[in-house]
A protein has these predicted regions:
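Glycan-recognition and catalytic cores of secretory/periplasmic carbohydrate-active enzymes
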Residues: 1-309
Length: 309
C-alpha cells in the first residue's frame, strides 16, 4: 500500500520507484539502474498477464525514456550523486551514464518487444548494444568503465576492478540475451531483429543470417519478418522495396525453404539534438548506421581545442 507511506529520503519514494504502485507510474524516475530493471519486470509481467493498466504504464515509461531521457550513445542516468534519471531533456554531455544502466535499458527493451512486437524497440536496444556496451570494455577485455560520459577532458580511464563491481556481470548478462534478441518467433512468424551474423533453430526450423542473406529450411510454412532499422536507407528485400510492412518489419512469405537477400544503405548521418537539450545547442554528432562516432584529439591546452564542421 503506497498511500500515506512515510518517506525515508533520499532512498525511498521516486528514488526507489516506490512512490506509487507500478501500474500508476508513467515516467522514468529515480536510480537509473534500479529503474530500468524494475521497468523490465513491469513489461515482463504485463506481457505474461496481459494486464492493460500495467501494459499502458510500461509503454508510457518506455516512451518517456526513448523520447526525452536517452543519450545519443544509448545510455541513461544523469546525476553522479544518486545515479538517477534527470528531468525530460536534461541530457548534459558530462552525465553519469552508468554501464549497468545501459545494459538494463537493453533488457527493458527486450521485455518491451515481448509486450508490443514493435520493431522500433530495437532501434533503442541496437544503439545501446553498438555504443555504450562495447565502449565500456577495453580492447584487451580486462578493463571496464563504471560511467560513460560523452565528453571528457582527457582525465577519464577504464578500471581493472572497482569497489562496486556490478558492471562486468551485467555485461555478461546482456551477452547471454543476444540469441533471444537477434531472432524471435511468434506462431508462424520469425523475426530478424538485429542484423548480426548468426544461426538459429526453432524446432525443425533452421535459419541463418550471413553476408546480407537469410537462409531458411523448415517443415513449417514460415513468414519472415525483417526489421527495417530507423537509420536504414534504400531498404530492399530480394532487390525490391518491401511491399508489406507490419510494425516496422518487412514481411516475406518464405514458405518452407528460401534464401532472402536483404540490402540497406548506411549513410553517414549528421544529427542534432532536440532543441530543448540546452547542452547541445550549436553541436552535432555523426553516426553511420547504429554506430556513434567519437571525436578526439590530444592537446596541451584544452582552451585551444576549437574546430568547425
Amino acid at each position: 500500500n503506497h498511500k500515506d507511506r512515510h518517506t525515508f529520503p533520499p532512498f525511498l519514494r521516486e528514488y526507489a520507484q516506490d512512490h506509487c504502485a507500478a501500474r500508476d507510474q508513467h515516467e522514468a524516475v529515480g536510480h537509473a539502474v534500479r529503474a530500468v530493471l524494475f521497468y523490465e519486470g513491469m513489461a515482463e509481467a504485463a506481457a505474461s498477464s496481459r494486464d492493460e493498466e500495467l501494459t499502458h504504464a510500461a509503454y508510457l515509461i518506455w516512451r518517456d525514456i526513448a523520447e526525452s531521457k536517452l543519450h545519443i550513445n544509448g545510455c541513461v542516468g544523469v546525476a553522479p550523486g544518486d545515479e538517477s534519471f534527470g528531468q525530460q531533456y536534461d541530457l548534459p554531455n558530462n552525465a553519469y551514464l552508468e554501464t549497468c544502466a545501459g545494459v538494463g535499458l537493453a533488457l527493458f527493451g527486450g521485455a518491451m518487444f515481448k509486450l508490443t512486437s514493435d520493431a522500433s524497440v530495437w532501434d533503442v536496444v541496437e544503439n545501446t548494444l553498438n555504443n555504450v556496451v562495447p565502449a565500456s570494455v577495453s580492447a584487451s577485455g580486462d578493463h571496464y568503465t563504471y560511467q560513460n560520459p560523452l565528453e571528457t577532458r582527457g582525465d577519464f580511464e577504464r578500471w581493472s576492478w572497482h569497489g562496486c563491481p556490478c558492471c562486468p556481470p551485467m555485461l555478461l548478462k546482456i551477452v547471454g540475451e543476444m540469441p533471444r534478441y537477434i531472432w524471435a518467433k511468434k506462431n508462424r512468424d520469425i523475426m530478424l531483429n538485429l542484423y548480426i551474423e548468426s544461426e538459429v533453430s526453432f524446432g525443425s526450423t533452421k535459419l541463418s543470417y550471413k553476408n546480407g542473406k537469410v537462409t531458411l529450411e523448415s517443415d513449417e510454412n514460415v513468414r519472415l519478418m525483417l526489421r527495417i532499422p530507423a537509420w536504414a536507407r534504400n531498404f530492399k528485400v530480394n532487390g525490391k522495396a518491401p511491399e508489406v510492412i507490419v510494425k516496422g518489419y518487412a514481411v516475406v512469405e518464405a514458405g518452407h525453404r528460401a534464401v532472402v537477400t536483404v540490402e540497406m544503405d548506411k549513410p553517414l548521418m549528421k544529427l542534432m539534438a532536440h532543441p530543448y537539450v540546452d547542452a547541445d545547442h550549436g553541436r552535432v554528432a555523426f553516426m553511420r548506421g547504429p554506430v556513434l562516432y567519437c571525436c578526439e584529439k590530444k592537446v596541451e591546452n584544452w582552451e585551444e581545442l576549437d574546430f568547425t564542421l
